[in-house]
Swiss-Prot record:
Pfam families per UniProt: Tsi3 (PF22211)
Subunit structure as annotated in this protein's UniProt entry: Forms a heterotetramer with Tse3 consisting of two Tse3 dimers and two Tsi3 dimers. Formation of the complex inactivates Tse3 enzymatic activity.
S-diacylglycerol cysteine lipid sites: C16
A single MF term (Gene Ontology): metal ion binding
Ranges where the record places region Disordered: 53-85
Signal sequence region: 1-15
Protein known as: Immune protein Tsi3
Annotated lipid attachment (N-palmitoyl cysteine): C16
Highest taxon in the source lineage: Bacteria
UniProt keyword terms in alphabetical order: Calcium, Lipoprotein, Metal-binding, Palmitate, Signal
Task of the protein: Immunity protein that plays a role in preventing early activation of toxin Tse3. Occupies Tse3 substrate binding site and prevents the substrate from entering.
Organism name: Pseudomonas aeruginosa (strain ATCC 15692 / DSM 22644 / CIP 104116 / JCM 14847 / LMG 12228 / 1C / PRS 101 / PAO1)
InterPro entries: Toxin-Sub_Inhibitor_sf, Tsi3
Binding, Ca(2+): E126
């Protein structure tokens, strides 16, 4: 009976991972203490406050994300969303796009002690607001050491 339960739990975990489609391949540590994981298929560059990720390959609409450490809290009027064991504040803005649809920009922050970890991402979509699954997964995994 324990074996069956273990197998079912393993299958459920695999289904969750496959459904999200978010995989990471390398842990990156910034001199400011920010620790993030690089998404598979993305190039990473260190910036003054964090990291920038650019989707590689010959894509029509490559995604771009930035993760940074921020000292100032986000504005209080942002929407909130559950993120892991905590909560994140966020906003999504839409601009008219080109042939690939509207451009959407996510800005989201989660508390990390007295500081904040901030993710910003942009995606183009012809089908309405994207889920930003990668950006949310990146923010959830990011931490300060």
């Amino acid at each position: 009976m324990k074996t069956v339960a273990l197998i079912l739990a393993s299958l459920a975990l695999l289904a969750c991972t496959a459904e999200s489609g978010v995989d990471f391949d390398k842990t990156l540590t910034h001199p400011n203490g920010l620790v993030v994981e690089r998404p598979v298929g993305f190039d990473a560059r260190r910036s003054a406050e964090g990291f920038r990720f650019d989707e590689g390959g010959k894509l029509r609409n490559p995604r771009q994300l930035e993760v940074q450490r921020q000292d100032a809290p986000p504005p209080p009027d942002l929407a909130s969303r559950r993120l892991g064991d905590g909560e994140a504040r966020y906003k999504v803005e839409e601009d008219d796009g080109g042939s690939a649809g509207s451009e959407y920009r996510l800005w989201a922050a989660k508390p990390a002690g007295a500081r904040w970890i901030v993710v910003s991402a942009s995606e183009q979509s012809e089908d309405g607001e994207p889920t930003f699954a990668l950006a949310w997964a990146l923010l959830e995994r990011a931490r300060l050491q």
